[in-house]
Structure formats: C-alpha cells, structure tokens
Regions:
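Structural signal for interior beta-strand "rungs" in well-ordered beta-sheet cores
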Residues: 2-97, 102-155, 159-161
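Solvent-exposed, charged amphipathic helical/linker segments at domain boundaries
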Residues: 146, 163-170
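Cys/His-enriched microdomains
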Residues: 161-164, 193
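Short cysteine-rich clusters marking metal-coordination/redox-active sites
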Residues: 166, 195-198
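Cys/His-rich metal-chelating microdomains
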Residues: 169-172, 201
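Short, non-ligating residues that shape and space the ligands of small metal-coordination modules
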Residues: 174-175, 203-205
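Short linker/helix segments within small regulatory modules
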Residues: 178-192
Length: 223
C-alpha cells in the first residue's frame, strides 16, 4: 500500500505489494520491487534500486543511484549515499559448478543490517553479512567487509576503523582536542571522548568494542 501523502514520481517503477509510508518521496526512475517496505518521511533519490523484501525504516535518506539488494534491513534515520551498493551474496556465480545457469534456489541470501542513525558514504560497498552499528559511519568509497561497532568511523578498502563519530556526525576528540584514534585499548579507562560540535560525551565499552553516550548535547547546541 502506498500512503496517499507519499510523493511518487511518474517515472518511478513501483511493483505490486510494496508498502510506502506517510510523507515519503520517491523520485525519478526509482525501482522498488515486490514485497519491499519503505517507512514514513523517507527520501529515495533518482535511479535508486530497492530490491524485493527490503525493509526500510522511517526518516531514511537513500541518495541517487544507490543499490539496496534483497536481504537488507535499514533501521530508522539511516543515510545511504549516492552510488552506494549493499550486496547480498558472499560467493557470487552466474553458473553452477556443473556449468548450468544458476537459479534462485542455487544461492542463499546473506543479510545486511544498517542500525539506527548510521551512514554509508557515496560509492561505498557493504559486503553481505555485515552489520553497521548505531550512528556508525562508512566513508566515501569504503569497502565494508566486516561489521562496524556503534559510532565507529571506517574508511578504505577493505574498510578499517580510523576513529569515532558523534550522533550528530562530527568526529569525536580526546581530552587534548585531537581526533580520537581508532585503537580501542586506549579507551578502556577513559570517559571523556567529546564532540566539538554539540558537546556530547562518550565512553568506550570494551566488551562491546563500541561507544556509549554518557551525556547529551550542551544547551543550545545542535541536536
């Protein structure tokens, strides 16, 4: 069902049995396949592809020409940059070992989950089987081959953790005001990773290898 308040461009290809939530915008030449669910107040940019069975939460932005394949779950507030690709097959082949054309039953979907508030940069590739944590960020062009902890900043090919980011998107700094380095061992006893933009403060959680917010934004700062 497409909510009456949703805006769907005339050139978009929306297959049957698709759910589109209130206030969502779907732009030029987007293809959304059968069984996909798109939540409320989302923006799906031109030439994006949403495969069958994909689940997209609320307030998600998927930019132009992004490809989101079967088996992907996108939680609320996620950003997927232009040209990003979210795959679903760790061992892709066009044919079977006997040389026959591979059919649907010859392969298994390996899911991807993008957690609340996470961001995937322009042209990044997320490999099947990966989970990207809450408010984590993959830089432009990254090839993400393993799961990313909450608030981690990863970049490169294959992607490696290079730092940590705030819920507002800014890179966190240490007590000296320098960009917080990636090495988690340096945070085992530290409670003062701060955001220079909004003032939130985070602590490293060794067991989870991720960050936990300890105090909210300062008064009058961007939320």
């Amino acid at each position: 069902m497409i909510d009456p308040s949703a805006r769907v461009h005339a050139t978009a290809d929306i297959e049957p049995d698709v759910s589109v939530g209130q206030g969502t915008s779907i732009w030029h030449r987007v293809q959304v396949r059968t069984g996909a669910t798109i939540g409320a107040d989302c923006v799906i940019g031109r030439d994006a592809f949403i495969d069958t069975g994909v689940t997209i939460g609320n307030r998600v932005k998927i930019q132009n020409a992004a490809l989101v394949y079967h088996g992907v779950t996108v939680e609320d507030g996620v950003f997927i940059g232009p040209g990003a690709i979210l795959t679903n097959d760790r061992y892709p082949r066009a044919i079977t070992s006997s040389g026959d054309l591979a059919r649907a039953e010859d392969w298994a979907v390996t899911p991807i989950t993008l957690r609340y508030g996470s961001s995937i940069g322009a042209g990044a590739v997320v490999v099947a089987g990966v989970e990207v944590g809450r408010f984590a960020m993959a830089g432009a062009g990254a090839v993400v081959t393993r799961s990313v902890p909450n608030h981690a900043l990863v970049a490169g090919s294959p992607a490696r953790r290079i730092g940590w980011v705030c819920a507002c998107g800014m890179r966190l700094v240490d007590g000296n005001g320098d960009p917080a380095p990636a090495d988690p061992d340096r945070y085992a006893a530290r409670t003062g990773l701060a955001c220079p933009n909004c003032g939130r403060v985070y602590a490293y959680v060794p067991d989870a290898e991720s960050l936990e917010e300890r105090s909210g934004p300062r008064q009058g700062a961007p939320a």
